[in-house]
């Protein structure tokens, strides 16, 4: 054994060939943490010191190659001063460069996923052989960063600037075949032939059949583009990528600028340019929020997986209420492998549900995400029915009938009488109390809420609502079923609106106040979209449905009359009474026309101004900043209340619920991280400036206490530098 550590071993294979193997003890995957980097330094030094070494094969002892850097270390690392961070980055890069500069040929055998630093390790080798099932990529832009272990330097010199820009700026993974096409790898082989192929390649390089030094040289030189080619490649790409990424996600454009700045330099100087730019990105609030988001997401998944120990396996599901929502739920269950009954009392509703499922499956087939055989299998897994005849062996029933407590209670009581005594019943409700609905049931312990978001196939979140009498098994089984459906479940306690809608309606309340103060809703939409929301509040209400918003607002006003009840007629009342219900009937705040793809396209409709005139009670001058604060303060404060009231258990779950459920701007990290980024004390002072607007703008006593103690929700303050 030439070197033995906890993450890396180097052993002799045959005839001077050694294998550097990544196998991080106690972990299911390999990653570049401090330990792995330190051991790579020692391993490279040990190889360099051994005169008998003629060639190096790099491999992995895990199912994956290396998934990248250990992101849990980023939070503390990125707090370091800029100069210290740059020095640390260059020190790490020296390891990869020393590996690249070994006086013998190097081959990496990529057996599974190689992402971020994992791929950058591969790029430092002379040759790359990849398993046909492996995938590679540089996803750092998704964290508000770009590659920092030489990715912006080596990749353009291996696959060309255009291809490298596409890989780095998109952050997408590539298949083995796609990687071969652009020259990122040298050979694709069947998984079982990978080791033999790597051995064959290294032997041919040692024998001189392949010139490894000539292969290595372009990575050490400047980029082979003249001034005109550089201008065409970089300026065009910057414009295109800036348009796609938008101003709130600077990393993709900064990555292109870095490749451009380093184009006329050799490797070592180019790495210095990369390090400076990488650290600049690491210090942005976008990176800190997106890294926080990634860690929150990991925490969420780990927590949801923790319910598996108590959960029953759902082998057969059912959905009550077909139509678009029922069809969407049936599709999601079937396509992920759980057969489902779809029941309704009307044949036409069942047909609508089946059409929805068929349309969604057809869409996947067209995009090549599904084979015709798999589509047929999924369709066969959805069984339509008008009766309860087959409900005896159902493990879990999702009730998805109209959002009316009396109707839901009647349907739930009826289905309870037709299922086994251990069957879980789950109500897909957006606002109605689960404990209230449970009063109609004989076995309330088997009952929970399971709130899907529309459209079901696209929205990743499912709120699993624990009622007063819900058993742990019922909650756990529903969480496990949601995960099986490919969703991200968050368990919340019962209250009107649960987490997401309870927080969303104060946001809509801020919007209604602005319109009543004479602010143009089109302007509000533009300001909030610029702030980072995927759509402004008026457009969002049109998509949700004005009737749905009207009903939800009444439920919330009844649940929280102290702050959510408004005796004045509002913008929602005006549109509802004028039967302008949004996209569903072609007119709401906006009018809707059908585009070439058959999708609704919004257009301004002057007729709406007459509808809104009676609810404009004053004409206020408000700045864009005021618009943001009128909208965001109530949303953030209600999120704080949900955490304090125990509706949601952790700050991470609260923030992820808003990002997954209502499209909260990811680069801002969620409502609580947004408060942290402003500073809790500063946020409280800001809210106090708007105190005249009512109870929704009043910070809680506990938040004031946090402000006075200098506390934060995530134990750190994120600030733009």
Curated annotation (Swiss-Prot):
Protein name: Fatty acid oxidation complex subunit alpha
Alphabetized UniProt keyword annotations: Fatty acid metabolism, Isomerase, Lipid degradation, Lipid metabolism, Lyase, Multifunctional enzyme, NAD, Oxidoreductase
The EC number(s) this enzyme carries: 4.2.1.17, 5.1.2.3, 5.3.3.8, 1.1.1.35
BP GO terms, sorted: fatty acid beta-oxidation
MF annotations from Gene Ontology: 3-hydroxybutyryl-CoA epimerase activity; delta(3)-delta(2)-enoyl-CoA isomerase activity; enoyl-CoA hydratase activity; long-chain-3-hydroxyacyl-CoA dehydrogenase activity; NAD+ binding
Catalytic site positions: 451
Residues at which substrate binds: 297, 501, 660
Residue numbers spanned by region Enoyl-CoA hydratase/isomerase: 1-190
Site for Important for catalytic activity, residues: 120, 140
Role description: Involved in the aerobic and anaerobic degradation of long-chain fatty acids via beta-oxidation cycle. Catalyzes the formation of 3-oxoacyl-CoA from enoyl-CoA via L-3-hydroxyacyl-CoA. It can also use D-3-hydroxyacyl-CoA and cis-3-enoyl-CoA as substrate.
Catalytic activity field: a (3S)-3-hydroxyacyl-CoA + NAD(+) = a 3-oxoacyl-CoA + NADH + H(+); a (3S)-3-hydroxyacyl-CoA = a (2E)-enoyl-CoA + H2O; a 4-saturated-(3S)-3-hydroxyacyl-CoA = a (3E)-enoyl-CoA + H2O; (3S)-3-hydroxybutanoyl-CoA = (3R)-3-hydroxybutanoyl-CoA
UniProt KW NADP keyword: no
Residue sites binding NAD(+) per the record: 325, 344, 401-403, 408, 430, 454
Pathway: Lipid metabolism; fatty acid beta-oxidation
SUPFAM superfamilies: 6-phosphogluconate dehydrogenase C-terminal domain-like, ClpP/crotonase, NAD(P)-binding Rossmann-fold domains
CDD domains: crotonase-like (cd06558)
Gene: fadB
Alphabetized NCBIfam families for the sequence: FadB, PRK11730.1
Coiled coil, from the record: none
Any single Pfam family the record assigns to this protein: ECH_1
The family this protein is said to belong to: In the N-terminal section; belongs to the enoyl-CoA hydratase/isomerase family. In the C-terminal section; belongs to the 3-hydroxyacyl-CoA dehydrogenase family.
Annotated segments matching region 3-hydroxyacyl-CoA dehydrogenase: 312-721
